[in-house]
Amino acid sequence: MQVILLEKIAKLGSLGSIVNVKPGYARNYLIPQGKARRVTEKVIAEFEAQRAELEKKQSEILAAASAQAARLDGLLVQISQKAGVDGKLFGSVTSANITEELRKQDFPVEKSMIRMPEGQIKQIGDYTVTVVLHSEVSAHITVSVLGETTI
């Protein structure tokens, strides 16, 4: 199915691109989320009329994401978990835990924005985690996992 993108989508295309996608992806995700429209002559004409407005909106979103990335970059997030004497956690620290801590510090992020290259954290220590705020903007934060040892 051919769709015209109304915003930049990572690994798919930029604003105004006409791309072929699987019908289910278009019907269930892109079109309901307002990220794309099915290609017809009428839709292309409407898009060209709204192009400047859409580009302005996208640049505002990018500027807001860049501002938030500047605030987030280098931030230290401390998370306490129960751990054994060897430093191994009982359980693990996931992207949901990191999201919760960031929200406590007034950073509105979603769980899907957190990228943990090593997967879930299972040891005490400091870890670098990436927060993807926009397809072009990301910030690196340090997650410090502290152990609450039980004796």
UniProtKB/Swiss-Prot annotation:
Alphabetically ordered keywords of this record: Ribonucleoprotein, Ribosomal protein, RNA-binding, rRNA-binding
Q: Which GO terms describe its cellular component?
A: ribonucleoprotein complex; ribosome
Q: Which InterPro entries match?
A: Ribosomal_bL9, Ribosomal_bL9/RNase_H1_N, Ribosomal_bL9_bac/chp, Ribosomal_bL9_C, Ribosomal_bL9_C_sf, Ribosomal_bL9_N, Ribosomal_bL9_N_sf
Task: Extract the coiled-coil ranges from the record.
Answer: none
* SUPFAM superfamilies cross-referenced by the UniProt entry: L9 N-domain-like, Ribosomal protein L9 C-domain
Q: Which GO terms describe its biological process?
A: translation
Q: What terms describe the molecular function in GO for this protein?
A: rRNA binding; structural constituent of ribosome
Organism domain of life: Bacteria
Q: Which Pfam families does the record associate with it? A: Ribosomal_L9_C (PF03948), Ribosomal_L9_N (PF01281)
Protein family (similarity comment) = Belongs to the bacterial ribosomal protein bL9 family.
Please give the HAMAP family that the UniProt record associates with this protein: Ribosomal_bL9
Q: What does this protein do?
A: Binds to the 23S rRNA.
Protein name listed in UniProt: Large ribosomal subunit protein bL9
- Which gene codes for it? rplI
